[in-house]
């Protein structure tokens, strides 16, 4: 890795994680020349209903399964920090990991509703944003209030890669074959998917803290 570790952040419910998340992450790694990607498995989304939401542990374990043998780290750091909103999480990460340069990864569906996020302009000022195409959402994303504000800060992936230091606000649009897989379709086809994952102690891949279980007391 370089002296500055370039890290993509992909946040979401991961309800469940699936191959589409992995494919987007691997594409961003190559297109932006990232060192690694962190998956921020959210304890809850203020803009989404809790109906049908699996436990945080089941969603985290599904993400671990999808991230195997790839430069992807799965983290529950939002739950550990106690942050509820993305803007607070990203500010904290920047302060906690000064040797890293972060870029926020999101699908076009998120950009279409980005103006509804708390302090969305502050998010854009905190770190660069890379938007990945998603089937059926490109038109809404292009017409969104957030795009109107960010349009003057757009740059190509090639120019972004070549920058010595990243700055914000910056918007990079990544184009590749859209992946049609969705967590909604997976839940519909297999509503009992969380039952595949057994409960127990895990260690967070970013903070290395124990999560989702009690440490056994020393003998």
Swiss-Prot record:
Catalysed transformations (reactions): nicotinate beta-D-ribonucleotide + ATP + H(+) = deamido-NAD(+) + diphosphate
SUPFAM superfamilies with a match to the protein in the record: Nucleotidylyl transferase
Domain of life, source organism: Bacteria
EC numbers for this chain: 2.7.7.18
GO biological process terms held by the UniProt record: NAD biosynthetic process
InterPro entries linked to this entry: Cyt_trans-like, NadD/NMNAT, Rossmann-like_a/b/a_fold
Keywords assigned: ATP-binding, NAD, Nucleotide-binding, Nucleotidyltransferase, Pyridine nucleotide biosynthesis, Transferase
Pathway in which this enzyme or protein is active: Cofactor biosynthesis; NAD(+) biosynthesis; deamido-NAD(+) from nicotinate D-ribonucleotide: step 1/1
UniProt-recorded Gene Ontology molecular function terms: ATP binding; nicotinate-nucleotide adenylyltransferase activity
Similarity comment: family membership: Belongs to the NadD family.
NCBIfam families assigned: PRK00071.2-2
Protein role: Catalyzes the reversible adenylation of nicotinate mononucleotide (NaMN) to nicotinic acid adenine dinucleotide (NaAD).
Classification via PANTHER family: NICOTINATE-NUCLEOTIDE ADENYLYLTRANSFERASE-RELATED, PHOSPHOPANTETHEINE ADENYLYLTRANSFERASE
Alphabetical list of HAMAP family matching this protein: NaMN_adenylyltr
Name this polypeptide is given: Probable nicotinate-nucleotide adenylyltransferase
